[in-house]
């Protein structure tokens, strides 16, 4: 049976929307959408760095959650202290309770489910927070709990080979029939490829392929619609 496993954040839904709403609620100085996009990209960059440090036990989860917006704001000379960063994170989490799937992703999940594909989730993050998002997106309509994997419960995070091997052994997967879909090149694409899986890069932020990349995605799409069309062609 073909198995298709999805990342969650910024793959199944637009993660930037919650960030935009949070900034517009809390920042006294109005920012344009483009300025918020730049702040969001900086926040994601620092989030990846600090998440890895948190996973290694070098900093606390709180320092990761507040540190990313503090570092991003510093880049743009926006004043913010730990108290305001805490409020930002709490508001951001609240806004994530309103997330919805990309419409084409919902259609894709319906198509794959009807075709009898085995569908799963692999997402990095803290268990409670990621579970909240999975519930908000109503992913249990297509993906059962036993096919849902959160790094915080496994003890390893992407791109470590161990997290992919864990799932492979748990589900007795055939590498040649297993596809992973994610937006993050290093964590999702390199992680899946070095484990021997096929990988589709959901590159809707239109990032450049790293020049030093030792692995390349099997397919690259730039929107949820392109992802849907890719699987419709295969049908």
Language-model region placement:
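Active-site neighborhood of HAD-like aspartate-dependent phosphohydrolases
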Residues: 1-6, 11-45, 75
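Asp-based, Mg2+/Mn2+-dependent phosphohydrolase catalytic module
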Residues: 1-4, 32, 110, 126-235
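An amphipathic alpha-helix signature
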Residues: 19-24, 62-70, 127
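Short, surface-exposed acidic
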Residues: 31-41, 75-88, 141-145
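A metal-dependent, Asp-based hydrolase signature
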Residues: 49-90
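Substrate-recognition element of Asp-dependent hydrolases with the DxDx(T/V) motif
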Residues: 87-88, 92-98, 105-137, 147-151
